C-alpha cells in the first residue's frame, strides 16, 4: 500500500545503517563495547525486497503469488537468480505508462509475461 513512504524509509535505512558506520561481522556478532549489531538485520533486509517490493508469498512447494510494488520514481526493478520453489528464476518489472510489464523467466523460458495494474496479484505455478 504505502510504496513511496516505504521507499523513503528503505533509502534512509540503507544509507544510515547498512552503508554507514559499522564494524566487521565477527565483532558485530558479539557486540561488546556497545558496537553496532547487524547480523539479524542483514537477513531481514532481504525480506524488505522479496516480500515488500516484490510481494512474494508462497502458496505451495512449487507455486507462489506476488504483487510487485514499483516505486513511482523507478522505471524498472529485477530480482535475478531466485532459488525457490524448486527452481532458479528471475522476475522483471517495468513501468509502461499506468501499467506494469511483469515477466517471470526460468531456465531461459518465459513462465509468465503480463501487463498488470499496480497492486494486482500474479500467480505462478512451476
Annotated model-derived regions:
Residues 1-126:
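Non-catalytic C-terminal accessory modules of carbohydrate-active enzymes
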Amino acid at each position: 500500500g504505502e510504496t513511496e513512504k516505504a521507499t523513503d524509509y528503505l533509502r534512509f535505512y540503507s544509507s544510515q545503517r547498512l552503508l554507514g558506520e559499522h564494524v566487521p561481522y565477527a565483532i558485530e556478532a558479539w557486540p561488546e563495547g556497545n558496537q553496532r549489531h547487524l547480523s539479524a538485520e542483514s537477513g531481514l533486509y532481504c525480506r524488505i525486497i522479496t516480500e515488500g517490493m516484490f510481494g512474494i508469498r508462497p502458496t505451495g512447494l512449487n507455486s507462489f503469488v506476488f504483487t510487485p510494488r514499483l516505486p513511482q520514481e523507478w522505471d524498472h526493478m529485477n530480482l535475478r537468480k531466485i532459488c525457490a520453489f524448486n527452481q532458479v528464476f528471475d522476475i522483471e518489472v517495468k513501468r509502461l505508462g499506468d501499467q506494469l510489464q511483469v515477466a517471470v523467466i526460468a531456465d531461459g523460458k518465459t513462465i509468465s509475461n503480463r501487463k498488470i495494474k499496480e497492486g494486482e496479484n500474479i500467480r505462478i505455478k512451476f
